[in-house]
């Protein structure tokens, strides 16, 4: 019989906001701070909100205008409740605001520094490695990890709770950042213990929350928990489908699965297995399974949300820039692709114009707020061979864009995917297909064209490698195309970003 395993999940608390506080010499648990690029519109999403601001009812991924409105509302209430209906100061510190109810709530809006967050995350991972071997750690995101600690508890003579506390306090001592942890008998249980149960647990003096679950305590504590979207892997779409059967808790899902599992498989396919297992608190995946996993198919993806609605031509410029960057990324990774996909999302206001509304005959859908919006344009383009050529990939994207994008509408989101990505050595072997001759065609001309194309691709490849070398040595903006200076181009700005935010 397999021994029961013990897993720990650790989530760094309001990570980006905590890093910004630490860099300013401030206490992350006592400082009102949001990480947001105020140079963008107030609709920009806050990447992080400090715990003290969350205590005022501000969501962790609120939009900036929601923060502004909530703080304004809170300050109006403070002003009204003040003895003279006036505010006599302001502060960004939670303890001062608690002591002075007639002060205005203030906050810092810190621009994101993605390279800095990566540095902190790397340092914290190094601290985890003092206690746990890399083969027993899975990095889930920049601020979250899973650990299989089963084989460490006996040698450390600690419980999982004690080990979690020790690691978190080591991180706090060396970085100033605290964390929340979940402990479970499988990967799913430690995750939901951290995400749901720990949020309602009492904090210690360092702001640390730790919760533990096994299959039975999971059923007692969380079978009646709402909403379902709080649970790992259940999004709004899945929750809506389950609600059609009157299922709004994990307990109801577990009971439903006893007699109606074929219906769940019909609705969700293979994902029904995860839903049913998780409803009962089961998870068969082990750390060794994660480490051994190798995807069958590989792809490279690039996407961006434009800062304002773009015209058809401006959107084409951005799509071409992205195609060029994708090709360079393939060259850098020594990969090639034979299939390109383009998805273009339209701006919500595209149909506000009565003339456009009258002329537009394309498909529509509803956004999450129930508003009628044009349906995202989507198309694929099979290439004639495996390639990393910027010329061929840009041509493919340009053709796709012209074919699928409606010039009447404003563009807001662009995503490009290179599918069937394989190593270039294998790709070159796949490309070595003989030229098929035809008695009724000029075969010599066909040979000559194929040879000329090979020379052009070889010449372009040398140029791409030289471009990458220059960019590595002197910065990404040291060598640019004329395209990058066209109206609407975003490439130069994105070269100074990581993940769409300032580095």
Model-derived regions: residue spans:
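Basic, low-complexity intrinsically disordered segments
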Residues: 1-503
